[in-house]
Amino acid sequence: MKVIFLKDVKGKGKKGEIKNVPDGYANNFLLKQGLAAEANNSNMKTLEAQKRKEEKEAAAELENAKKLKETLEKLTVELKAKSGEGGRLFGSITSKQIVDELQKTHKIKLDKRKFEMEDAIRSLGYTNVTVKLHPQVTATVKVHVSEQ
């Protein structure tokens, strides 16, 4: 019997796949548990419509990430911190502080985990910080740390 998997089934198929499985397995397990649906014309059309919808959403998400990248690369995030001799900071500037400043001054909401910083910023001046907005889109934000 041909079935469309509605959920991932270990060793049998992934969500959205169409596979031929034994009739008994399909009727007694997959269909009863709601893990699969019979692959008839109406279910096939539903699956195609769902795939098209997911592709549109993915394209829209990518487009939004590209727009956000353009916006972020034009900005400079201004932060103030106390520093000692030679421009070394007392403490450090973390991705959380950068996110808070972006939210406060530019109304841009980002997740602090999207910032790719090896270490926190520990000196005065300009620093470029990369932000992973989407698996295919990476932006660079300029952060300026000045004396408080």
Swiss-Prot record:
Signal peptide: none annotated. Keywords: Ribonucleoprotein, Ribosomal protein, RNA-binding, rRNA-binding. One of its GO terms (molecular function) is rRNA binding. GO terms for biological process: translation. SUPFAM superfamilies: L9 N-domain-like, Ribosomal protein L9 C-domain. The keyword ATP-binding does not apply. Belongs to the bacterial ribosomal protein bL9 family. HAMAP family: Ribosomal_bL9. This is Large ribosomal subunit protein bL9. The gene is rplI.
